[in-house]
Each structure stands twice: as structure tokens, then as C-alpha cells.
A protein has these predicted regions:
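Conserved glycine-bearing catalytic or ligand-binding loops at nucleotide- and phosphate-handling centers
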Residues: 253, 268-274
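Core catalytic lobe of class I
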Residues: 1-259, 264-265
Length: 274
């Protein structure tokens, strides 16, 4: 099943299929950005799908061929973000190191969503996801995302002399200052709450999280892919941000719910994906 939309040159190509089938249709070096909220390896059976068992052999059997395909279709200037939790992130990082190269690892984003801890738990409470960011090469697209400070921060103006920071002073000898009103986001994101009671999945990711990723690693008109698309929140964000989209989910309910979100009208299959 395929439903596509095209408006003013922008296209959304949404599929209900296994992601390996879709990636096999895409040419080498075509996609600008890949974001996937992957299977977390809980081993649990949910209403609409069976999650992978948390065993290394099973995880590798599923992800190695898929990550190899993602590397093939990604442009030289492209980046890949894979989101998971602490159960399998160490295994996924090893796969990404092997496929993309250890030196292409850019950072691990910690998205902490602050859900209350269980009082009886005999371990440190985990309330974060891990988002692994790799680039295909070192000339990848990166647009710094800025965080506004609630209270401007007072900083001294300094200059570098032989590697030493020294104060900058005016003609009267008074040290000059400036006020910082915004800073670049680091790799710990604690300002986006978890979205509960999602359209299909209880832990559907919030639009603000995906928006930050797409803005940081793509430009308008670029092609963004999501091969574990769920209810296609990534497609909706792409539509809002004037990015093109291709992606899939194996669950037919994802397509049905994406239609309900008003994502579709018409399109022809883009030639550059053949």
C-alpha cells in the first residue's frame, strides 16, 4: 500500500511495507537525512507488533542489513539519527561504528523527559532516550539550534593573547561585559516532554523533538527518510518545514492514522527515487 502527496514541488512518499523493501528501491546517495525511532528490543508483544527480543544476535540480524542500506542511500553530506533507549544502544553503536566508521560518530544525544520514578525500584531510574548521531562524511550539514535563556547571562568580554584569555577594557580601564541571551543546544535535551497517549504508540515522539533534529541536519527542499515511521509524525514535520519525505511502517494502522492527520492528497512517485 502506498499513498503519496505532492504540493508545489514538495512530496511525501509514505509506504506500508518492510523497510528493507523500500530502501531497495532508493538510489545510492539520495537521502539527505535519516531519522528513525527504532525498535527498542524489549521482547514485549504489543497490540500491533512484536518487539525484538533483547539478544545481541537477534538485534544484529535485524539491524545490520538495514543500517548498511541506510548508509548506501545517504548522501555524502547526510546524517543519520537512530533513537532508542539504554537496552540496545551499545549494540547499535557498535553496528554504526562498523558500517559508518568510528570517526563518523558525531555525538550521543540524551533526551530526558522527566517521567516520575518508581518508588520501589532498586536501581537508578532511567527517564531518557539515547539518540545516536553519525554522519556519512565530515562535511555533513549542520545548522546550530539555539536555546533562549530565561535570564540573560552576564559574560566578560575577553581576547586571546598567546592562548590566554585576557579581559577587554575600554579607554577608562573598565572591563567590558556583554549579555548572552541564547546558547547552542548541547547533547542533553531536557526541555521537550514525552508525548503520552500517542496516535498509535503510547510513546510516540513529540513533534518538537523531530523538528529540532530536522532543522539541525537538513535544509528546505531536502529529502528526509524515516523507516520506522509509526503514525508518520516525521512526515508531518517535514510537511511543516518544507522538506520532502520518504518512509514506511509495517503496521497498516500507521497509514490509516496518517491519512486521518490530513497528510495526503496526491502525487506521482518522484523520479529521483527510482
Amino acid at each position: 500500500m502506498t499513498v503519496k502527496e505532492k504540493k508545489g514541488g514538495q512530496f511525501l512518499d509514505i509506504r506500508c511495507c518492510d523497510n528493507l523493501e523500500l530502501m531497495a528501491e532508493i538510489k545510492d546517495n539520495t537521502v539527505d537525512l535519516i531519522y528513525c525511532d527504532i525498535l527498542y528490543g524489549t521482547g514485549r508483544k504489543f497490540a500491533d507488533y512484536q518487539d525484538l527480543k533483547p539478544k545481541r544476535g537477534i538485534i544484529e540480524e535485524h539491524y545490520i542489513p538495514r543500517i548498511k542500506e541506510m548508509h548506501r542511500i545517504l548522501k555524502d553530506t547526510g546524517s543519520i539519527y537512530l533513537q532508542m533507549d539504554t537496552k540496545i544502544n551499545h549494540w547499535i553503536r557498535c553496528i554504526l561504528d562498523d558500517v559508518f566508521g568510528y570517526d563518523k560518530f558525531q555525538c550521543e544525544i540524551i533526551w530526558t523527559y522527566g517521567i516520575g520514578l518508581k518508588a520501589k525500584s532498586k536501581k537508578f531510574h532511567t527517564h531518557n532516550d539515547n539518540i545516536l548521531l553519525y554522519s556519512k562524511n565530515n562535511n555533513h550539514v549542520y545548522n546550530p539550534q539555539m536555546k533562549k535563556l530565561e535570564k540573560p547571562s552576564k559574560r566578560w568580554v575577553t581576547k586571546m593573547i598567546k592562548g590566554v584569555n585576557t579581559p577587554v577594557r575600554d579607554n577608562n580601564g573598565k572591563q567590558e561585559t556583554y549579555y548572552v541571551t541564547e546558547v547552542k543546544y548541547g547533547n542533553v535535551w531536557d526541555d521537550i516532554p514525552m508525548r503520552r497517549n500517542g496516535i498509535i504508540y503510547k510513546t510516540e515522539k513529540p513533534k518538537k523533538l523531530i523538528e529540532r533534529i530536522i532543522k539541525a541536519s537538513s535544509n528546505e527542499g531536502d529529502l528526509v527518510a524515516d523507516f520506522y515511521a509509526g503514525s508518520f509524525t516525521t512526515a508531518e514535520v517535514c510537511k511543516d518545514l518544507n522538506r520532502n519525505f520518504i518512509g514506511c511502517d509495517i503496521n497498516p494502522n500507521g497509514i490509516a492514522k496518517a491519512k486521518e492527520r490530513g497528510l495526503f492528497s496526491f502525487t506521482d512517485k518522484p523520479d529521483k527515487l527510482d
